[in-house]
């Protein structure tokens, strides 16, 4: 059963007294880890600019192929609180990281840690890795996702860069962007269905609320009419 809501008081954040439907919808999605938007968040950790160049090239190629809801962030310059908010917003996340001492670059690892402690789930991940003599960041990021983030999918089209991207990486970049475009198209259908389901739920809730406002006599008359319609009278 539901009761009329006049005020929404989250544990962390302001108290909302107006436009409650908007904020309740946001919290409903966040609590179920459902993305707010079907789009791509590209997060990169770059030491000398080469991983950044690959991330920007991917963003440009996605836009050329029709996926324009794309955001690109430097994990070294953007505070993790903003990155987490965007991770909850978008359906697809691309992690682009250089290898650092046979590990994930520290600021990227910190970002992943925050996703873990906040239980982010139900996302599609793409991977770009970079390194020189021992490229490990990609496999380590995949392992971290598999072990710590629930109900997430990792695209098979990983891009591997040896220090800086060259012509041989063009096919990998193309394959990764194609995989993301295909996945976004699939997710779009799921988004459309959720919109339909949410609208149906809202309509049913409105109908229930209107029914509760009726007098006992009006309710009985409405129920009798519904019964007659069901019998085909």
Task: Label the model's feature ranges.
Residues 17, 49, 79, 134:
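Flexible, glycine-rich phosphate/dinucleotide-binding loops
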Residues 39-43, 126:
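Conserved beta-strand elements of the Class I
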Residues 43-65:
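Short, charged N-terminal beta->alpha structural module
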Residues 1-8, 13-15, 57-73, 83-233:
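FMN-binding flavodoxin-like domain, especially the glycine-rich phosphate-binding loop
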């Amino acid at each position: 059963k539901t009761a009329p809501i006049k005020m929404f008081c989250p544990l962390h954040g302001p108290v909302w007294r107006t436009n409650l439907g908007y904020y309740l919808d946001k919290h409903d999605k966040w609590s179920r880890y459902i993305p707010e938007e079907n789009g791509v968040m590209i997060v990169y950790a770059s030491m000398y600019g080469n991983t950044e160049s690959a991330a920007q090239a991917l963003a440009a190629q996605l836009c050329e192929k029709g996926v324009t809801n794309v955001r690109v962030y430097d994990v070294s310059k953007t505070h993790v609180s903003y990155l987490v908010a965007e991770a909850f917003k978008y359906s697809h996340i691309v992690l682009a990281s250089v290898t650092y001492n046979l590990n994930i670059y520290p600021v990227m690892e910190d970002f992943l840690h925050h996703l873990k402690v906040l239980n982010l789930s139900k996302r599609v991940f793409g991977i770009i890795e970079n390194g020189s003599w021992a490229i490990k960041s990609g496999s380590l990021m995949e392992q971290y996702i598999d072990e710590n983030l629930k109900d997430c999918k990792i695209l098979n089209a990983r891009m591997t860069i040896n220090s800086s991207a060259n012509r041989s990486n063009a096919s990998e970049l193309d394959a990764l962007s194609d995989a993301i475009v295909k996945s976004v198209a699939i997710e779009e259908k799921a988004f459309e269905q959720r919109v339909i389901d949410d609208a149906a739920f809202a309509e049913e809730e409105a109908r229930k609320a209107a029914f509760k406002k009726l007098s006992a006599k009006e309710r009985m008359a409405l129920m009798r009419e519904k019964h007659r319609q069901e019998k085909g009278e």
